[in-house]
């Protein structure tokens, strides 16, 4: 077996070493992942981020080195985290960062790390949402923390934090932070660390028998934190910091004082706050400086705690100054952001084989982001390859749930290099080519560069290189420091690049110079030709919401090389060449383009472009191009043989002195306002002009003169949608056509996609990707449905979710979680959500959603706005409102939405009491199906009125108009609706649209009064028609309480029935205040009989005056149709008369359930006294309202009160337990009204005493054995503690005591009665040296009831030393071996013996004399032996001996005639029975002296013996009543058969010592 164990252990170690995983570089995994890889080690400098892996089971040890991290994260609200390490042989060693975070999740998470040991010197974070209770347990057997541990919840729940193995110990020398958490102590706590409770957290010391180090600190960091300590008889001192501002310190029992001590006390000199419950207390070292008058007793009823009524103390003042320990100064950091949880982009290279069988290498951008549910998906944009003539490009957009593992590449080649965060420096570059061998040298960069499109863009970017066929100088241009730019996911900018790198967020900057060539770029000297890289590629990608992009062109002319640093913080790029083709929505038809920009000292600059007649660039809503101006005089010219004159103005932006040059023409048309980024500013006037063009392609070279003004003027170009012109709107494309291309998927497969491509010159951009080919009737729809699923065990279950249907193909998009209970309430409400379109763009939709439990179903989707401007819509919704008193209520009404602005138009009145009996009419928006006359089914939406089970359609909404992209005549010919108004007159040349909305108006009645009405209004043009008028606010009545300021300035609280009509309140009835009586004031209170709390009304007793009372009740009502229903309300009773005051409205299924019940509470009166009141409470959800307060009733003069109490009860099976509940007291009569249920798994503490053996040496050398007391107790957790009492040896009196003994095991208790005897075993007092021997726990020996002082004993006894006394010259020796206990009236206190034991009366010596003839006389003192038997044993004694008298030879026993001094054999001694006196034969009873003839010469005895009258009476007691105890005073237990004997109790010293010793131990 030993060999097998060793082999198994060796095999286990070998298996873990083989399966070990070592993380050496940053790694990100998303989706399902199996962590059964053995030991996991994360090396320094590396991190492992696991995202949306629902179950993470660690099967081996976990080691995180310094500067390393392990992150397990959930970003989905529907996905929880289950992280476990359950191997008892595994360890956790953290020197870096461990972070488990599921705070976005709406479900419960579990972090359960067991293992052999846990050592933390770094930082550990555990976070959950708190919507449902979560498990956070770090229960390793060996547990040590010297770093930071932080536990977070978004809101507090009943879940607790558990640290260490229960009943074990933990060592904390670091910081443990709690946020909305409860830490429940289950171990002893060592070390000098700190527990910090913050944001409504509680530290709960649940077991003080497990000691807490006096150097451990507890810090209450905010006003809602608290600490609670178990209250038992073993107090400790707890160091508490930060006590004040309303936070709480408490114990687990109500705070009650006794005769000598108050419920709490504070010592200003020591800083100790003592909280007491009668005899038990706990001490808290809160420090000095507190004002005792600011303490108050409160109740800590936080979630996850045993709620103790009035068991805590709060301090209303600020925290006095006190230095915090070093461990409490360790900052409680927030949960760090895990790598990979933010959307990111990176470039990748894909090598495939084309149709010709040749390898094709493509480069693209991978965009990783999440949808609205937190699910990850990726989209890839492929860059097109370059071509010398015409080139085509494709933009591949693939969307799929991401479950990829991403690692950075160490290669310097263009490859897949995603970073660990949202930034990306690695990218790729498509170099340009030239047909001339002496052409320009392609520019180079220190890193591969590429264009990274902005995250979330609805359009992809493409790059088309151009080739230069013109000769140019060979001055190579290099870019030593590639510029980089990162577009965050929330922004929308365009990005233009020419062999540049985009990575971190920064603007592209190229230094500029004046007349001397001071550029950092190498340039050719004194060359009049343009210095270029052979060509420059540009890519543009702009989502519809883009606001700004910058474009920088750099001149490498020897005269001047300058660019103005760009101040834009948006995406920007650098063009390190002077030859370019621009694909910024500008048609450049010539594939050969060469432009040169020169700059001189006089500030003039010229650029020629033989490639296109369109040398001006339109500024669109998606992108704008920025040219630097290097002239000192801010003037430049661009030559182009065109008839148009364009002006360029420069507008400096922000403090970085970037000049934004925008080209505009002299034609005026419609204008638009440019948008700028948040960090740029325009300090000059701006004029708007329009650019139009009659031709976009000219075969002959043309020039255009462009002049630039100073920095005080700016013109922004806009385009009108004329023929072949450049448009400023995002939907006006230069050329669009449909094409097909191949896409390489992530799994390497090649698929064909089709879509709409935009062509601008030689630049192609994918606008739309079509879904897979379907028939003309295959329409993709999404709907909610239910289906059956066969589980792995063969069972069939039903699931529901959202399914996408395309033709005959169905795809499950979302599966709803099953309802948690059968009573889930279905509600409908209006909301807004995000949808990811097929092209990867994200749009926002609104509609009506049905919620049942945690399941959501989309009922109606509102049509999107038809124009680009904000459209005002109105819909019905529900929201929460915080009232002036801080309470939260729910309101419903009609809300107007304009863009992102919401305005409340109408607030619906709450349900009223008048609508109880009758059906309530409500109006709401819904969707239904209609079967048309041709049999087809269509869906309509509108406003429906519901009255009972009847529905009436009030308004039917117009169906949305769906237009194709190129159908410009589609849609209503209306102008845009102003987003700032609810309705607007249509333009004069447009057809008016009829719309319906809810509004409020005032009406003047015939009597001149003005009232306000609300309803649904139809608007057609400027004509308004009222369709529906809402009913006015109804009047409702309910019971409430309010405060009133009396004439003397005092504030009183009144209760009564209030009528509410709209926002108007009227008091109908004011309840009489309750009469407060003292307990003994029998004349106080109304002279009425007691009202039974279980009935709604009761007859008043005769002879009493009837008092009118009001209370809540429920009754049954029969309708006119014979149906029966139940109503509730407030009933007034006067004598035997009942009147219904108020009928409560019935509760609806969509709201909280309203209940009413009787309760008792405490009220602080104006004089500071606390009184108890009872009444009827109305509970709706978490809100409580006092409906009626009962007046104290009297029964024959006695006052009836109700209060909460705790008592001890013996159940029918003999079990003794402690119960709590509400007790009613009337005079001296007490009745139990309510018994609180006991918490599940309650274990009662047990205290049991056992005897132990002490041995002492008497002065005469004898050993005296006594029994001591061993106290064995168990706490509420069942943990046994054993303590042996110290027994003094100071008692030398003989007393007896009778005790009633109660012995409890768990919650079963037994009672018996016994008698104890104390006596002195040693004649003199000597110091005792004791040794104890535990009698064992097999049979309980003794215990003492703390309340009564009674002792419990059992039936085992040890031998006692004999005690010798002398009586009448005879020595009585008693046997010392016994199995039972006995006392006798003999002074010797002899103990009983076995049946063969006997007591001996020793014979004395004697002499004789006589004549020689054989006769004579003599005297002797020979003793007689009396046999003594156990009074409980009827058998005769044996072994009786008689010592022979000293006589002449020949004497023998038995004696013969003749001689004297012979011993006498007593008769009857062997048959002494109970209560019998032994007799001796020979004529005398019990002789002590024998005289007679002596033995003469020759040995003949002569003479007759005679007996003296000296006698010894020996009597025996048959009934035993106690036990013998030693001089130590410790009781020797008696036999079980003697239990029940009683006699008077003497207040002996030894009993006092026993009680003192036991209570001192407790």
From Swiss-Prot:
Keyword flag GTP-binding: no
Record's GO cellular component terms: cell surface; extracellular region; fungal-type cell wall; side of membrane
Compositional bias annotation for Gly residues: 1407-1419
Upper classification of the organism: Eukaryota, Fungi, Dikarya, Ascomycota, Saccharomycotina
UniProt cross-references to Pfam families, sorted A to Z: Hyphal_reg_CWP (PF11765), Hyr1 (PF15789)
PTM notes: The GPI-anchor is attached to the protein in the endoplasmic reticulum and serves to target the protein to the cell surface. There, the glucosamine-inositol phospholipid moiety is cleaved off and the GPI-modified mannoprotein is covalently attached via its lipidless GPI glycan remnant to the 1,6-beta-glucan of the outer cell wall layer.
Residues making up the propeptide: 1539-1562
Name of the molecule in the record: Cell wall protein RBR3
Region Disordered: start-end pairs: 338-366, 383-729, 1404-1424, 1455-1486
Signal peptide: 1-20
Entry membrane topology: Lipid-anchor; GPI-anchor
Ranges of biased composition (kind: Low complexity): 338-353, 383-415, 422-729
Record's compositionally biased regions (Polar residues): 1468-1486
Protein location: Secreted, Cell wall; Membrane
Task performed by this protein: GPI-anchored cell wall protein involved in cell wall organization, hyphal growth, as well as in host-fungal interaction and virulence.
Lipidation (GPI-anchor amidated asparagine): 1538
Keywords in alphabetical order: Cell wall, Glycoprotein, GPI-anchor, Lipoprotein, Membrane, Secreted, Signal, Virulence
Induction notes from the record: Expression is repressed by RIM101.
């Amino acid at each position: 077996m030993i060999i097998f164990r060793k082999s198994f252990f060796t095999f286990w170690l070998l298996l873990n070493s083989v399966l070990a995983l070592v993380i050496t570089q940053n790694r990100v995994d998303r989706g399902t992942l199996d962590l059964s890889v053995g030991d996991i080690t994360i090396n320094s400098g590396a991190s492992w981020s696991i995202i949306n892996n629902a179950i993470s089971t660690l099967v081996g040890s976990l080691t995180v080195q310094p500067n390393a991290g392990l992150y397990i994260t959930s970003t989905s609200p529907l996905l929880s985290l289950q992280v476990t390490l359950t191997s008892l042989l595994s360890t956790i060693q953290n020197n870096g960062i461990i972070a488990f975070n599921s705070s976005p999740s709406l479900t419960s998470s579990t972090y359960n790390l067991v293992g052999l040991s846990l050592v933390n010197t770094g930082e550990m974070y555990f976070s959950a949402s708190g919507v449902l209770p979560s498990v956070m347990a770090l229960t390793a057997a060996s547990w040590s923390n010297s770093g930071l541990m932080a536990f977070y919840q978004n809101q507090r729940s009943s879940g607790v934090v558990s640290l260490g193995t229960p009943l074990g110990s933990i060592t904390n020398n670091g910081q443990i932070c709690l946020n909305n958490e409860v830490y429940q102590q289950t171990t002893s706590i060592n070390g000098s660390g700190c527990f910090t409770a913050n944001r409504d957290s509680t530290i709960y010391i649940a077991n003080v028998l497990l000691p807490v180090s006096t150097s451990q600190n507890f810090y209450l960091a905010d006003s809602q934190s608290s600490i609670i300590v178990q209250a038992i008889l073993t107090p400790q001192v707890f160091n508490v910091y930060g006590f004040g501002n309303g936070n709480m310190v408490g114990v687990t029992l109500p705070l009650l004082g006794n005769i000598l001590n108050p419920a709490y006390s504070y010592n200003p000199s020591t800083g100790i706050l003592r909280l007491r419950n009668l005899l038990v207390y706990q001490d808290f070292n809160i420090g000095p400086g507190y004002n005792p008058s600011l303490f108050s007793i409160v109740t800590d009823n936080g979630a996850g705690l045993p709620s103790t009524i009035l068991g805590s103390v709060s301090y209303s003042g600020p925290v006095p100054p006190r230095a915090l320990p070093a461990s409490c100064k360790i900052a409680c950091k927030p949960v760090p952001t895990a790598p990979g949880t933010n959307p990111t982009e990176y470039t990748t290279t894909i090598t495939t084989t084309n149709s010709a069988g040749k390898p094709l290498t493509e480069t693209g951008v991978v965009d990783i982001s999440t949808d609205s549910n937190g699910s990850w998906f990726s989209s890839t944009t492929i860059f097109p390859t370059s071509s010398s003539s015409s080139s085509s490009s494709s933009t591949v957009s693939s969307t799929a749930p991401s479950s990829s593992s991403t690692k950075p590449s160490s290669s310097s080649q263009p490859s897949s290099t995603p970073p660990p965060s949202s930034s990306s420096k690695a990218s790729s570059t498509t170099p340009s080519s030239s047909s001339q061998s002496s052409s320009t040298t392609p520019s180079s960069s220190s890193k591969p560069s590429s264009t990274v499109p902005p995250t979330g863009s609805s359009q992809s970017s493409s790059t088309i290189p151009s080739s230069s066929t013109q000769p140019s100088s060979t001055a190579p241009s290099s870019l030593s420091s590639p510029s980089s730019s990162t577009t965050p996911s929330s922004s929308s900018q365009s990005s233009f690049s020419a062999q540049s790198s985009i990575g971190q967020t920064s603007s592209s900057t190229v230094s500029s110079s004046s007349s001397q060539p001071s550029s950092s770029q190498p340039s050719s000297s004194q060359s009049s030709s343009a210095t270029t890289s052979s060509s420059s590629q540009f890519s543009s990608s702009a989502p519809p919401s883009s606001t700004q992009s910058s474009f920088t062109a750099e001149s490498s002319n020897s005269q001047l090389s300058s660019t103005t640093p760009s101040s834009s913080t948006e995406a920007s790029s650098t063009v390190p060449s002077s030859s370019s083709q621009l694909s910024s929505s500008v048609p450049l038809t010539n594939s050969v383009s060469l432009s040169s920009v020169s700059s001189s000292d006089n500030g003039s600059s010229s650029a020629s472009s033989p490639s296109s007649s369109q040398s001006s660039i339109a500024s669109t809503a998606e992108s704008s191009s920025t040219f630097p101006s290097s002239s000192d005089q801010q003037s430049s010219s661009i030559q182009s043989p065109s008839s148009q004159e364009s002006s360029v103005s420069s507008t400096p932006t922000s403090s970085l002195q970037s000049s934004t040059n925008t080209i505009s023409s002299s034609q005026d048309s419609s204008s638009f306002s440019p948008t700028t980024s948040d960090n740029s500013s325009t300090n000059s006037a701006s004029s708007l002009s329009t650019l139009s063009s009659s031709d976009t392609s000219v075969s002959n070279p043309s020039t255009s003169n462009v002049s630039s003004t100073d920095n005080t003027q700016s013109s922004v170009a806009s385009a009108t949608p004329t023929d072949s012109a450049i448009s400023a709107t995002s939907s006006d494309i230069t050329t669009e056509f449909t094409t097909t291309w191949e896409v390489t998927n992530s799994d390497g497969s090649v698929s064909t996609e089709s879509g709409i491509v935009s062509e601008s010159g030689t630049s192609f951009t994918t606008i739309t990707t079509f879904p897979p080919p379907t028939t003309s009737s295959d329409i993709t729809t999404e709907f909610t449905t239910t289906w059956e699923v066969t589980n792995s065990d063969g069972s069939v279950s039903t699931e529901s979710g959202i399914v996408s249907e395309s033709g005959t193909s169905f795809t499950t998009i979302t599966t709803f979680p099953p309802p948690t209970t059968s009573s889930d309430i279905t509600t409908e409400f209006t909301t807004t959500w995000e949808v990811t379109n097929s092209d990867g763009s994200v749009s926002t939709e609104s509609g009506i959603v049905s919620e049942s439990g945690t399941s959501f179903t989309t009922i109606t989707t509102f049509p999107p706005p038809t124009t680009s401007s904000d459209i005002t819509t109105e819909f019905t919704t529900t929201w929460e409102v915080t009232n002036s008193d801080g309470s939260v209520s729910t309101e419903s009404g009609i809300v107007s939405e304009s863009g992102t602005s919401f305005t409340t138009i109408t607030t619906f009145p709450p349900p009223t009491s008048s609508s109880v009996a009758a059906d309530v009419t409500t109006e709401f928006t819904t969707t239904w199906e209609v079967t048309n006359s041709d049999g087809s089914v269509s869906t309509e939406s509108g406003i429906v009125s519901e009255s009972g089970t009847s529905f009436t359609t009030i308004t039917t909404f117009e169906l949305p108009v769906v237009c194709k992209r190129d159908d410009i005549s589609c849609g209503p010919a209306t102008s845009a609706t102003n987003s700032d108004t609810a309705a607007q007159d249509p333009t004069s040349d447009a057809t008016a649209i009829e719309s319906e909305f809810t509004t409020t108006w005032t009406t003047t009645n015939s009597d001149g009064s003005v009232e306000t009405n609300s309803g649904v209004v139809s608007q057609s043009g400027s004509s308004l028609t009222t369709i529906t008028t809402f009913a006015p606010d109804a009047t409702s009545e309910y019971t409430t309480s309010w405060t009133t300021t009396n004439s003397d300035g005092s504030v009183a609280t009144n209760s009564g029935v209030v009528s509410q009509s709209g926002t108007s309140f009227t008091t109908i009835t004011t309840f009489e205040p309750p009469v407060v009586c003292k307990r003994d004031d029998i004349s106080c209170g109304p002279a009425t009989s007691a009202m039974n709390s279980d009935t709604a009304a009761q007859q008043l007793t005769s002879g009493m005056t009837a008092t009118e009372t009001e209370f809540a009740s429920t009754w049954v009502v029969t309708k006119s149709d014979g149906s029966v229903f139940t109503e509730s309300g407030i009933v007034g009773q006067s004598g035997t008369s009942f009147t219904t005051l108020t009928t409560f409205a019935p509760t609806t299924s969509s709201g909280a359930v309203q209940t009413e019940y009787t309760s008792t509470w405490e009220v602080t009166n104006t004089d500071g006294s606390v009184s108890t009141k009872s009444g009827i409470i109305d509970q709706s959800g978490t809100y409580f309202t006092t409906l009626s307060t009962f007046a104290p009733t009297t029964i024959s003069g006695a006052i009836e009160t109700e209060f909460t109490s705790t008592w001890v009860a013996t159940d029918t099976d003999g079990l003794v337990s402690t119960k709590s509940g509400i007790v009613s007291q009337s005079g001296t009569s007490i009745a139990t009204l309510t018994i609180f249920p006991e918490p599940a798994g309650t274990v009662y503490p047990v205290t049991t005493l056992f005897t132990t053996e002490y041995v002492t040496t008497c002065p005469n050398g004898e050993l005296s054995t006594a029994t001591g007391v061993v106290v064995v107790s168990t706490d509420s957790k069942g943990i046994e503690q054993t303590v042996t009492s110290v027994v003094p040896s100071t008692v030398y009196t003989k007393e007896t005591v009778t005790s009633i003994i109660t012995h409890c095991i768990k919650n079963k208790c037994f009672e018996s009665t016994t008698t104890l005897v104390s006596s002195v075993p040693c004649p003199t007092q000597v110091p005792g040296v004791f040794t104890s021997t535990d009698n064992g726990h097999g049979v309980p020996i003794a215990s003492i009831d703390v309340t009564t002082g009674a002792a419990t004993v059992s039936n085992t006894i040890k031998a006692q030393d004999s005690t010798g006394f002398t009586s009448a010259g005879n020595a009585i020796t008693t046997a010392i071996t016994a199995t039972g206990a006995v006392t006798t009236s003999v002074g010797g206190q002899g103990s009983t013996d076995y049946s063969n034991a006997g007591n001996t009366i020793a014979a004395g010596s004697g002499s004789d004399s006589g004549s020689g003839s054989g006769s004579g006389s003599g005297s002797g003192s020979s003793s007689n032996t009396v046999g003594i038997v156990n009074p409980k044993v009827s058998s005769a004694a044996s072994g009786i001996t008689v010592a022979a008298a000293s006589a002449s030879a020949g004497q023998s026993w038995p004696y013969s005639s003749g001689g004297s001094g012979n011993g006498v054999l007593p008769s009857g001694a062997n048959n002494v029975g109970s209560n019998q006196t032994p007799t001796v034969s020979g004529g005398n009873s019990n002789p002590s002296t024998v005289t007679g003839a002596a033995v003469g010469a020759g040995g003949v005895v002569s003479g007759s013996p005679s007996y003296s009258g000296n006698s010894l009476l020996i009597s025996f007691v048959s009934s035993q009543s106690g036990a013998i105890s030693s001089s130590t005073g410790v009781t020797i237990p008696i036999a079980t058969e003697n239990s029940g004997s009683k006699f008077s109790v003497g207040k002996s010293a030894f009993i006092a010592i026993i009680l003192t010793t036991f209570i001192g131990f407790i």
